[in-house]
Amino acid sequence: MRLTLSCLVVMLVASPALAFEGVMEASLSSEQGVAARVRARYSKQGDVRMDIHSVDEDGEPVRATTLMPSTGENYFSIDHGQRVIVEMPYSTLATTSKQVTGSGDNANLAIKKLGKATVSGVETRHIRVIDKDNRTVIDLWLTQKYPADLWTRAFRGRNLGLELSDDERSKAMKKYGVKPGFSMKMRVEQAGGVPVVFLVKKVQRAPVPPEVFALPEGYQRIDGPSAPQP
């Protein structure tokens, strides 16, 4: 199957931007309302913690965390309701990244530049990306104010069906004359699907205490799936 730009915002592997230390807060919503609230925190050493707050089918709150240390071979997915920590190797992410290498060269897109707009107090460039092969429309509101890889670094440990690495995304954007940037807002609409909107509420540079990136005590710790063997 040909890998495409179905979610240009992807979040697989990126080089840590060590200069950024602080927090990003965002929401994920659809026509039915806000589906999840996201809070990502970044250390100046390159550690990332992402917390997602949502509700289950019964309306009960659900809180999940992904911890991605800047050193070591593993990252951690934490289910606070079950009090479980799943330890997974970074090598699984590297394997997925190899599968998308080169996909930005073959992207069959139409690009529309729709002017400027202010999103959460930040001036942005509104770009519409139309994936002709998959009938997907992606609206991006881009800024140069923040590192472009903050989304990728926060989400790379979660399986969201997002397909391009930062390098491939940038390659595809540049091919069509668009300067890559940080997405303050993203709207993704696939043919026959429900539009989904990622909206950044706040990005703030601020010191983050080391204990934010520590694993919680008293949780059961289990091994997750290993990387497939070549």
Region annotations inferred by a language model:
Residues 1-5:
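Positively charged n-region of N-terminal signal peptides that target proteins for export
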Residues 14-16:
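N-terminal signal peptide c-region/cleavage motif recognized by signal peptidases
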Residues 19-230:
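Extended soluble regions of mature proteins
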